[in-house]
Amino acid sequence: MKYAVRLEQCKRSNYAYQEIRSRHYIPNHGAIGQQLHYLIYLDKEIVGIISGGSAAYAVACRDSFFHINKDNRQIALNGIVDNTVFRLEKNLPNLGTQILAMWRRRVADDWFLKYGVQVAGFETFIIENEHRKGAMYKADNWTFCGETSGSTKLHEHGVIKSSVRLRTEKKLVFCKWIKGRKLPEDYVSSWNLPRGVIKGQLSFL
């Protein structure tokens, strides 16, 4: 069944967005880097939010999936969008999968318009419990790549701050290519921080 859903781009400061974001299982500590946010409408009702942001700097299983290495990392990561937030407050069969597929197509177009880079793929990180196992991503044909280790190092402008190590919960990692797309090889960011690396980016080692 197809539902009458649509996505409306909004600012992160949007009241409705923030209201729903406050109920997401991951605490709202703000967002860094490139990002796009959307309200999810079912008919005329706002039923959720979904967001995309800059890719995490270093994730072993993700890097293997997208063939990312230390030589191409800074440029290649610009072609990956992280599905940072997805909260749906309407429980209908297959609704989440329909929205996820719609978001992939929409954010790829909007990302190019805003940042000037063609999106080649997506990543997401899920803190698993008895209810969260990535079912919507599996239904949308994302690939389960592995788990993070539960340990991160803080990066600033691509340099690991070895004195700073943060403990985090382990996360399931799902990724998806856009068919026929390749990661950028010569992208120069139009954003206002150094190319490809966002201050404060985390790596999941």
Where are the language model's segments positioned?
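Double-stranded DNA-binding cores of transcription factors and transposases
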Residues: Y3, R21-Y25, Q34
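Acyl-donor binding region in acyl/amide transferases
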Residues: R6-Y15, A31-L36, L42-D43, I49-G180
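Hotspots on structured nucleic-acid-binding interfaces, especially in canonical RNA/DNA-binding domains
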Residues: S13-R23, N28
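Short, cationic low-complexity segments
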Residues: S190-L205
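Short, charged low-complexity linker/loop segments at the C-terminal edge of domains
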Residues: K179-N192
